[in-house]
Amino acid sequence: MRPSTPPLLMLLIVPAAWACTSPPATGPADGGAADAASPVADAGSPPADADPPPPVPQDAGPLPTCGDGTTPTILAAGGERTHGATMVITGCRFGDDDAPGPRLFDAVDNQPAYEGLSVGDVVPTDEDAPWTRNGSPWATEVRLAEEDARPHRAAFYRAAGGSHGGDGFLGWPRALGGTRPPADQLLLYVSWWYRPSMDPGGGEPEGANKFIRIWDNDGAERSYVSWTHMHIGYSGGERTGWRSFTQDGRVGRWNRMEIIVDAERGTVRHYVNGVYQRVSHSSVGEFDIDDYQKRPEFADLGLNVAVLGFDHGLTSYGAMVTDFGEIYIDTTRARVEIGDAPTWAETRHREIQLPTAWSDGSIEVTLQEGSLEGLSGRYLYVIDAEGNVNEEGFPL
């Protein structure tokens, strides 16, 4: 995207997120098949000027095997380690997925609905657009922006200006059913990148400022999860879970945000920059959210993202700028990540990958480098549908 007013799709025709290059086809290891019409060589001693025979390869030892276990195991990863390239991951216990890839991957610059739009234009909610809602009467409209985008991206979403400033959000994505999510949609995994220009709890009054709301309907009564800058509230729980964004989040920089809501297990798990946000309450101390309940009167509806951005309804954040993008939403925990540390627990910078094929023993992904500044020397992780992960990363 350009800083003036040319159409956004001038840079979106071949979205970087989905650029895919296949490795070149290779022939036989000896450089090609022998000519069938060639005469058979004399089985005796070779001519004096003949090339010496190739060395006999030494035993390389047994091929690696998966062995026993219950977690995904990566044995090999083939392909170039560059953004947009195709990587094939082989191993075992990945699980099967007949429909690989997220339900929605919105990198902004990969949305055909934004063709012809320019920097500063309002994000549309037309029938072909990914989102059905942009803001509210008390919020700033979300617009397209490009200034200081993450590496390999041409655009992102921005809320800024006016009396409400950084108060802006998108909601009810079409790919997940809009305001009528299907009844069997009881698990959501959501990942996105978020950059606040100021402390999202630094206004006066402070407010309760939502990063994301997950609902089953947009009526006055609903099942809900609301993650704010200081706590998380949810239906069914007897207490609010407290934890400040600024413990692990960074003002003025891009932050990886993740949340998993599972209505069948009754669990909510959320993360900032790879750190699990274990919450606390004065009555019990720290605790995990294992008592989330979807209200039975809404059994005909599943879960969807009602709000994503920054939602507060106050004027005390008028000077704030809210940037967000690279939104990945799926109905399974299964995914592929590349991280900055040799164990999953140590990773603090992870980039989610885009799967194009998935079976129990093989996964194909389109590589996303993000801001890792190179993929070689990083570590590969596969998470299965149950949330199991290879704790020891596979070195790239």
Task: Go through each PLM region and give its residues.
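Ser/Thr-rich, Pro/Gly/Ala-heavy low-complexity intrinsically disordered linkers and tails
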Residues: 18-64
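Beta-strand/beta-sandwich contexts
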Residues: 57-106, 110, 318, 327-354, ...
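Extracellular beta-strand elements of beta-rich domains used
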Residues: 108-109, 114, 192, 257, ...
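Extracellular glycan-recognition surfaces and repeat-rich motifs
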Residues: 115-156, 162
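Secretory/extracellular carbohydrate-interaction modules
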Residues: 145-240
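Short, aromatic/His-centered strand-loop micro-motif at the edge of beta-sheets
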Residues: 234-256
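Localized edge beta-strand/strand-to-loop motifs within extracellular or lumenal beta-rich domains
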Residues: 253-269
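Flexible glycan-contacting loops in extracellular carbohydrate-active proteins
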Residues: 281-323
